[in-house]
């Protein structure tokens, strides 16, 4: 989906969905427990936010092949963001939330171009890392240099 389409769907989903929750996991936690475990932790915390607000989750559908440890039925669906509308919606919410965090980071550290690459490992991002080193929000466990820019 284009960024414009995602923004449109983001607004519709937030307005029309019965319930939704987002949990951002910090770069420090990701460095400590790895990206997969951080994703599972985010799923678990998002579920707990809904449960704690009184929503009864009958099944938690997760994109991928792993599931978080939660107190409700859970199902992993590989490539679920291309198959299951609820996972598609969750994916749009998460991506837009992350993009907005990257836009805020761009205001604080404009030399990295976060609003352009949204934190993904593009040539532009690797060039910025080569020129400026990591900023306080970079995941140090991620390969911070690209073989092509060496």
Report each predicted region and the residues it spans.
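RNase H-like, Mg2+-dependent phosphodiesterase core
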Residues: 1-150
